[in-house]
């Protein structure tokens, strides 16, 4: 009887071993997410027929370029080019940013944060002196135009870039250029961003 019990126990051991729950297989590792691919920058626009010198604006957010329209706004373009060549805009900050509308710069007060309450009120001290409103150069997306406080002839050093077409401004402000490269940069500008350098493209 004892022998029979021992034999039965010995025979049951292999069955007990194989009856154990198999160890869980390791789960396959989840695939690593792919790094996001940056969208390519928009291709530069072709210069407009009759366009003049191109002005490069290097900012803390990147660089954009705009063509000028000396045929339609000769006095304005001459005035802006003179300011650019004497480095008037270097170190100035963008003092006005309205998303989907405009970005604006050109006030020397913006070099000084203690004068922030005066940002947008100053210029070079020498206005253009002539209103050169044009029916040809309109406020399309990327237009560059002169800011003023009521009289286009008194526009001085402040200019703005339209972030979308703004036809309601046509005939009220002198459009003297258009962004042809780096339009995506203009949409990233915020109040306080600095113009590191502004120069005429060789």
Predicted regions and their residues:
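Bacterial N-terminal signal peptides that target proteins for export
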Residues: 1-7
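Cyclophilin-like peptidyl-prolyl cis-trans isomerases
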Residues: 3, 17-202
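Hydrophobic alpha-helical transmembrane segments of integral membrane proteins
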Residues: 10-11
């Amino acid at each position: 009887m004892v022998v029979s019990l021992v034999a039965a126990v010995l025979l049951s051991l292999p069955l007990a071993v194989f009856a154990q729950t198999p160890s869980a297989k390791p789960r396959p590792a989840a695939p690593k997410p792919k790094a996001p691919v940056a969208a390519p920058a928009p291709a530069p626009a072709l210069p407009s027929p009759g366009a003049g010198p191109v002005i490069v604006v290097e900012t803390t957010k990147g660089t954009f370029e705009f063509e000028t329209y000396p045929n339609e706004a000769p006095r304005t373009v001459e005035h802006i080019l003179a300011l650019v060549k004497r480095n008037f805009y270097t170190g100035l900050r963008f003092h006005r940013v309205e998303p989907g509308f405009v970005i604006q710069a050109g006030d020397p007060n913006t070099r000084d944060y203690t004068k922030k309450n005066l940002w947008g009120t100053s210029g070079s001290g020498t206005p253009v002196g002539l209103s050169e409103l044009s029916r040809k150069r309109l406020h399309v997306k990327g237009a560059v135009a002169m800011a003023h406080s009521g009289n286009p002839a008194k526009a001085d050093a402040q200019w703005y870039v339209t972030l979308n077409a703004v036809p309601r401004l046509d005939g009220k402000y002198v459009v003297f250029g258009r962004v042809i490269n780096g339009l995506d940069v203009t949409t990233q500008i915020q109040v306080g961003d600095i113009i590191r350098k502004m120069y005429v493209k060789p």
